[in-house]
Amino acid sequence: MYLSICCCFLLWAPALTLKNLNYSVPEEQGAGTVIGNIGRDARLQPGLPPAERGGGGRSKSGSYRVLENSAPHLLDVDADSGLLYTKQRIDRESLCRHNAKCQLSLEVFANDKEICMIKVEIQDINDNAPSFSSDQIEMDISENAAPGTRFPLTSAHDPDAGENGLRTYLLTRDDHGLFGLDVKSRGDGTKFPELVIQKALDREQQNHHTLVLTALDGGEPPRSATVQINVKVIDSNDNSPVFEAPSYLVELPENAPLGTVVIDLNATDADEGPNGEVLYSFSSYVPDRVRELFSIDPKTGLIRVKGNLDYEENGMLEIDVQARDLGPNPIPAHCKVTVKLIDRNDNAPSIGFVSVRQGALSEAAPPGTVIALVRVTDRDSGKNGQLQCRVLGGGGTGGGGGLGGPGGSVPFKLEENYDNFYTVVTDRPLDRETQDEYNVTIVARDGGSPPLNSTKSFAIKILDENDNPPRFTKGLYVLQVHENNIPGEYLGSVLAQDPDLGQNGTVSYSILPSHIGDVSIYTYVSVNPTNGAIYALRSFNFEQTKAFEFKVLAKDSGAPAHLESNATVRVTVLDVNDNAPVIVLPTLQNDTAELQVPRNAGLGYLVSTVRALDSDFGESGRLTYEIVDGNDDHLFEIDPSSGEIRTLHPFWEDVTPVVELVVKVTDHGKPTLSAVAKLIIRSVSGSLPEGVPRVNGEQHHWDMSLPLIVTLSTISIILLAAMITIAVKCKRENKEIRTYNCRIAEYSHPQLGGGKGKKKKINKNDIMLVQSEVEERNAMNVMNVVSSPSLATSPMYFDYQTRLPLSSPRSEVMYLKPASNNLTVPQGHAGCHTSFTGQGTNASETPATRMSIIQTDNFPAEPNYMGSRQQFVQSSSTFKDPERASLRDSGHGDSDQADSDQDTNKGSCCDMSVREALKMKTTSTKSQPLEQEPEECVNCTDECRVLGHSDRCWMPQFPAANQAENADYRTNLFVPTVEANVETETYETVNPTGKKTFCTFGKDKREHTILIANVKPYLKAKRALSPLLQEVPSASSSPTKACIEPCTSTKGSLDGCEAKPGALAEASSQYLPTDSQYLSPSKQPRDPPFMASDQMARVFADVHSRASRDSSEMGAVLEQLDHPNRDLGRESVDAEEVVREIDKLLQDCRGNDPVAVRK
């Protein structure tokens, strides 16, 4: 019937396919248990829904129909879903009682085109315990039963199969150890128990024994069954059979034929009837080999030859025979038959050997080295066992030609030690390079007739010294791995071979230390030290690492030294298509871009170019462009390789004004990845721009990347130039701000300065000489102005600076002399300078530190009449005008708004600096608050109120001449916050005599310098000029010109002097005194040092030409100020001439080098 059904289906559906499905389900599952899904497991295509199936005479019952079912009451298939399920509980034991493997089969017709052959295996579970056929077993055993007597027991039954079946038996409740249990197996694997008597039974002591037999299966957990064994001890027969002799001896040749009678035994029993009838048999403990060689007749007691006898195997055989009667409880009788075999020459000699060298011998072994110990035996006796032995192809006993070496000889011989024992030794030196292995054959022959021969061969390997390193089969191993691999993946193997033997040839592999970038190679790969297998330790990325190399070391285990070699392994990472294309042109928003095309665009008009990027390489990165949707009217075409979209139809009136194209970019990897973009193309009115050609067919276009690169490059160059320009301008303005001070602010006004580039003539009123040494008043407000050790250790500090236009750099003309270490800032001026502590000529120096200081000794000063304290207070507030000069504002509105100088509510820094400059040491430290300052100073004019204030505004007034009688200079000074009635006191000199007086300028005794508020009284000093002053050298020969010229000729900058480090110190050392002449009284010259005017000019010119040098160069100048070789004490100088020379020198410098002055 099945054949007819299949034929019908084959005729009806010619495209049928056959599929096999195997399922398994444990037994005892309930009804409705799903075993499997036929459609999913067979990977069948889903059929039509039941509502759509039908027609053509086909059934509408479902997609799955059961054609054949071996157990329809147990299994069924859902017609619609294809689920295979159970209809009821399945019992394997009842279904397949006698079969270990239980299997059901079905044939299902699915989707009208596939036939599924289904097999369901019913798996056994341990649901059945072993069972016995009865609960008790009754046994009768005679008390005379000998120990070892066996009694079969009833076996248990377990319907389960396999491991769940019956496994073993246990015997319990045997308190006296009389019985034992032996479990045996039949040919089919079933197990059965036997009861064994361990000790003799005594009915008189106990006539009944109760035992428990337990059967166990192999399930988890195991199940068991028990049965009770009742043993009854029965009384036995009183008489047993008796043999004629207790033992018999029989001689028999070893080659006796089968059936030969060995002996005829006879035993008698005094009992009558069954108790006297005797039966013969072998005893239970007769070996199986004897049973194989002999047989016995149970009634007659005749023993015959059953097998082949061998003297050499056993020359004497013993046969135990028992005789028992047929009465109840028989007691058997026993006798022993000894069979002695007669030897025949039927055995060849036997050769055995023990290798001393374990089959290996070093090639350095000397002659006579023992290789093996040989023993030759013959199982035959007498002459048949007499032997002769020799080495085939070697020397020794009975030596002769043989095989195994050059000329058919081997370098070995046989030496006899004692009977049948020989030693194989070398008889000449060995050479492994000639032959590395020998096959030694030993021949033995006996003395029988005819003689029999035997041979024995063994191999001797010649060991080499460890003189060969491992050698790789390749110098370079190239391995490949796909990216995104799994860590631990096998990459390949390297193989190194070592011709040495043993440990000398055992090769181990390792990776030599190296790095890939900054990462150790041990984080990339590992090698199996035994077989050279290389594994990846990480997942590789082709885009990051395309290939890398490392070295593998192969090392043998030889002694005394390991030999090694290495090979290079190159791992190439293969690209995997793991990156999808990314569309970069046109710019997409939500995967959509809008484009416009003129209506008069002709055929081949370039609408746009679609560009995509793919990070993969090779075929995985090669892209293809195509239009997948929206081009039903074939209005556009796209170049598959370049992505250019061109028109195929003019945009006439009847064409849709908006076209939506779907462009797909696909790479060529496996599997392929793609990206999709939607392009909305709108036709707009108007004509093509001029220069855009109408092309019919292919349109030549230019690459957009070139103008893009050019545009970006141009923009970058313009931005770079703008940044450089701004940086240069900001640097110049910052430099002007840093060099700005209130003393020269007035030159920034156009009416005074005459424009930015116009220079103002410098006169003597532009130079201010004040004393910079002040006593420290407040330790909390100290500004350190020393920049070198020479300044820190010098008692006096000099600072010379002229008022220059704002375009000039800070301190272009400045002469420094060591001065006091600290400059105390009054607490009232903390808003301007308290937070600043600097060194050297800092950009934030106060005007007081920039004022020129000149040293005088006993200078006969004319009276310097100062105004009252009220007048000075009035003059100190003139710079509070909003248009006042600022230390930071250049006057052109370019100051930073964060600068504090713009705050007009704060006090002027110039006012503060003036107060600092006018502070001096007094005996009275008592201070009182200042009076309220007036708005204007009495010295101010209308011009200065409009254009800015000058020195005349803040300088003290000159009083009338009738006040000149005051000889103490401190009475001519007014110091803010100090009482007006200053007690007259002179400063102590450094002279040990302690005379308190002012020394005349140029005298030996030197005191502290006096503070000069105004230079005019001293310019009127009636001091005659020295004759040295009359002889002023010409400008062409002066060293000043020699210094200025190279500075002004170097591109208009003062930096030209920097080409000669130390030039300033070298030039100044010719004219300036050293610190030692002022510090130590013991080293003072007898005549005080003086400087001629030309020498002062030279020094100031040198300083001026090197004003831009750094603080370290200025420190070198200061160290040269105390040159010990200067002897200018004979020269007298007039202060007015000094100022005149400085004024002339500065005007010359500005006239000759305006660029340098500006910078």
Curated annotation (Swiss-Prot):
First and last residue of the signal peptide: 1-17
Extracellular topological intervals: 18-707
Polar residues compositional bias, start-end: 867-879
Cadherin domain mapped to chain residues: 18-132, 133-243, 244-351, 353-472, 473-583, 589-695
GO CC field: GABA-ergic synapse; glutamatergic synapse; plasma membrane; postsynaptic membrane; presynaptic membrane
One BP term from GO: presynaptic active zone assembly
Membrane topology: Single-pass type I membrane protein
Entry-listed glycosylation sites: N22, N266, N439, N453, N504, N566, N590
Compositionally biased tracts (Basic and acidic residues): 880-895, 1120-1132
Protein name as catalogued: Protocadherin-17
Origin species: Homo sapiens
The gene coding this protein: PCDH17
